[in-house]
Regions:
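Phosphate-binding glycine-rich loops and their immediate beta-loop-alpha structural context
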Residues: 109-157
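Helix-rich effector regions associated with P-loop NTPase G domains
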Residues: 2-10, 15-19, 31, 38, ...
Length: 318
């Protein structure tokens, strides 16, 4: 406990004197932090400072000392970070802070939309209490009818629990709607390699800063072009964060079995109607979740994923 109190104390420590300004950490390479002056709109080199973290702010072997997304105060002359402001939230994977939305991006063609990976991403976002949005890319490669079938399937299984934005970078479709929704926010763009994250960010920032890649014909998957998380400022108060692509994703780590139900928004209106307060919605009698599953108020895919998640998360703690 005293270690945590010491950490909180030194994380808010400030200095007198010096040429101090406030900024956001947009990149980290080894022991260097790249800080964007908060008063600057663009990511020009002269607005970014390569800084080290002041020694008294370091806790040995602690990756959370200072992470991408942190709001910091730094001495622009000495290039030293002297204060890290309190975070409103942070993600463990990738390690980021102060996020408003998790943008989950999947292609409607290749790589194939993986509903299991998508739902794992929703679980991880929900555990950190960060709202998620679904971005469907490459919609110009399918017909309007095929897109509608896709949207209907998402609606059928997830209802109104997640906003959906169909987009095409090539045809400039849906980008204005997406940009309007995320205006003034810090949004991660996460998804499998090859889904179009880099192309989307390049379009929004108006430069080909990020390398894009092609889909492997053999695996129908993309090759990783992003190896680290990076912040990009697309206007005065809107950030996109490019994150490394992936093909698999871990389940969140939960301590209590009852925590899992809270990560399924469609369960919320039925949980308190269960006969037993400790109902886990598996084999218990009088389970309102199972009753509403039979009525069609909860999708079979979502309930099966709940069981699958429960088995994987608590397999060693039954």
């Amino acid at each position: 406990m005293w270690v945590q109190k010491l950490k909180e104390l030194i994380m808010t420590e400030n200095n007198n004197g010096g040429n101090f300004i406030k900024g956001k950490i947009i990149r980290k390479i080894k022991g260097f932090y790249y800080v964007l002056d908060e008063n600057c709109i663009n990511l020009k080199e002269e607005n970014i400072y390569e800084c080290k973290l002041r020694g008294t702010l370091k806790i040995k072997n602690d990756k959370l000392n200072c992470i991408i997304g942190d709001i910091v105060e730094f001495d622009k002359d000495e290039k030293v970070i002297t204060k890290v402001e309190k975070r409103k939230n942070f993600l463990y994977r990738p390690l980021l802070s102060n996020i408003d939305f998790i943008g989950i991006l999947f292609s409607v063609v290749t790589p194939n939309f993986d509903f299991t990976v998508f739902q794992k991403m929703l679980l991880n976002a929900g555990q950190q209490d960060i709202p998620a949005i679904l971005i469907l890319s490459k919609i110009d490669l399918i017909s309007d009818e095929e897109l509608q079938i896709f949207l209907n399937e998402i609606k059928e299984n997830f209802g109104n629990t997640i906003p959906v934005f169909p987009v095409s970078v090539e045809k400039n479709i849906g980008l204005d709607n997406l940009l309007s929704y995320i205006k003034g926010k810090s949004v991660t763009v996460s998804g499998p390699s090859g889904a179009g994250k880099s192309s989307l960010i390049n379009t929004f920032i108006g430069e080909n800063i990020l390398e894009t890649n092609e889909i492997s014909e053999k695996t129908s998957r993309g090759r990783h072009t992003t190896t680290e998380s990076r912040f990009f400022k697309i206007d005065a108060d809107t950030y996109l964060i490019d994150t490394p692509g992936f093909s698999t994703l871990d389940f969140p780590k939960l301590k209590e079995k009852k925590e899992l139900e809270l990560l399924f928004p469609e369960f919320s209106e039925y949980i308190l109607q269960c006969k037993f307060r400790d109902c886990l919605h598996i084999n218990e009698p009088g389970c309102s979740i199972k009753e509403n599953l039979e009525k069609g108020n909860i999708s079979e895919m979502r309930y099966n994923f709940y069981l699958y998640s429960f088995e994987n998360i608590f397999s060693d703690n039954k």
